[in-house]
Design a protein with these regions (language model features):
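N-terminal helical cap/lid subdomain that shapes the substrate entry/recognition surface
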Residues: 2-107
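Asp-based, Mg2+/Mn2+-dependent phosphohydrolase catalytic module
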Residues: 1-7, 19-20, 86-87, 110-114, ...
């Protein structure tokens, strides 16, 4: 590997665990709807609301990369169905999104970012819709690219190419750090970027492809990258 100039980070499940965050955010949204727009919950459960979003991603493949649009549009449908104004959707989403950005960072996230920020240009690519400024991490990153803004999801190599183009970088001196074998490791490889698999659980490499550079903690990155 040539001397590294820049590091791209995945966000969800790399810098924080995302599953519990989404659960808390959805329950906060349900509590809001119960108080302000109760007819929605007379018609739907959390599971049926999730099912609608999944169906919408199938019905609107051109928008499947935009989790914000899918959630807002499904909420608009719920509003119309329950006889409420569509403005309900934006109100409910605002509640969801506030809690969605109240993440609990992994213990190694800030120490690693502080060390790496002093030596490398740092970027982020995420399929999710987290707000680094709201989370308090924007100071570390030169640029963050979300799938909803890029128009595509990882592992599409074009999302990596778009970030590299904006950063004025070639792929050969860039590494991408993430937890997902397909979205992060295979996506980076397809873009010509060196992947680093963040394997916190110590799992076996699950595919027939050669295993990538691997770390069990973000604090291993400074030594790995030299």
């Amino acid at each position: 590997m040539r001397e590294v100039q820049a590091i791209i980070f995945d966000l969800d499940d790399t810098l924080w665990e995302v599953g519990p965050v989404i659960v808390r955010a959805e329950h906060a949204m349900l509590e809001f709807l119960a108080g302000r727009y109760p007819r929605v919950l007379e018609l739907h459960t959390l599971d049926s609301m999730r099912d609608l979003r999944a169906r919408m991603a199938i019905e609107h493949p051109a928008m499947r990369h935009d989790f914000t649009w899918l959630r807002l549009e499904s909420l608009r449908r719920h509003a119309r169905e329950a006889g409420y104004p569509e403005s309900m959707a934006q109100e409910a989403f605002a509640v969801f999104y506030r809690v969605r950005n109240e993440v609990t960072l992994y213990d190694d996230a800030v120490p690693a970012l502080e060390r790496l920020h002093a030596r490398f240009r740092l970027f982020a690519i995420s399929n999710g819709n987290a707000d680094l400024a709201a989370i308090g991490l924007a100071r570390f990153f030169e640029h963050a690219l979300a799938a909803r803004d890029a128009g595509m999801l990882k592992p599409d190599p074009r999302i990596f190419g778009l970030l590299l183009q904006r950063a004025g970088l070639g792929p050969e001196r860039v590494v991408h750090v993430g937890d997902d074998v397909i979205a992060d490791v295979e996506g980076a490889r397809r873009a010509g970027v060196t992947p680093v698999w963040l394997n916190r659980a110590g799992e076996q490499w699950p595919t027939a492809a050669p295993p990538p550079l691997t770390v069990g903690s973000l604090t291993e990155l400074p030594d790995l990258l030299g």
